């Protein structure tokens, strides 16, 4: 996965041209897999062209959302965290791409599309008068002892919350809500939509909201 600004095109990553035209595009913060060329190819195919840039977000952290995705992981979401600065990525979307992204993110079901305060996100193409957007989880943040859990894979300064790896948070959910062997349970979550949705309902009932 690239660790620098890049251009998504032909289903992969290329260097981002220094004169890339950001005007007219909507900057959308990517806090999980939407930063990866592999995920973007799954969502947009090989014909899409999109800038993906590295950025810093202040007063938020990237934490686990209180639901299980159909591919068997706990998705990420943003949650307020005073004095924290977290590394995020930005997808620069045209009108058609934004509509497609809304569909893949289940806007109105799992997420709402929200504007961040102007200047909260800094990085390539972003200025103090430009507001980036993000997908706010309708399910709330997965909580342990009443506090959200950050993603250990995401770099942050002055982090306020405990941080878990993806496998650790899945094993915690299994310990609290699952039965049988971990792998058997996880396989069932991927293959059984009603069972996964029932678990998501239990997680969201105990979630915390910003």
Task: Describe every region a protein language model picked out.
Residues 1-210:
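Glycine-aromatic micro-motifs
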């Amino acid at each position: 996965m690239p660790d620098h600004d890049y251009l998504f095109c032909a289903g992969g990553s290329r260097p981002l041209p220094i004169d890339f035209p950001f005007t007219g595009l909507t900057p959308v913060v990517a806090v999980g897999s939407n930063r990866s060329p592999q995920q973007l190819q799954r969502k947009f195919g090989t014909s899409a062209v999109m800038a993906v840039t590295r950025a810093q977000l202040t007063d938020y952290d990237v934490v686990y959302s209180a639901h299980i995705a159909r591919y068997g992981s706990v998705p990420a979401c943003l949650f307020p965290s005073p004095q924290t600065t977290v590394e995020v990525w930005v997808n620069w979307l045209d009108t058609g791409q934004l509509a497609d992204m809304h569909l893949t993110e289940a806007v109105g079901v799992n997420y709402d599309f929200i504007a961040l305060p102007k200047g909260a996100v800094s990085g390539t193409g972003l200025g103090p008068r430009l507001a980036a957007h993000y997908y706010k989880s309708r399910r709330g943040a997965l909580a342990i002892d009443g506090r959200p859990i950050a993603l250990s894979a995401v770099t942050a300064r002055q982090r306020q919350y405990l941080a878990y790896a993806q496998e650790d948070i899945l094993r915690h959910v299994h310990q609290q809500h699952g039965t049988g062997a971990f792998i058997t349970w996880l396989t069932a979550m991927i293959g059984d939509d009603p069972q996964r949705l029932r678990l998501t309902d239990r997680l969201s009932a105990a979630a915390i909201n910003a």
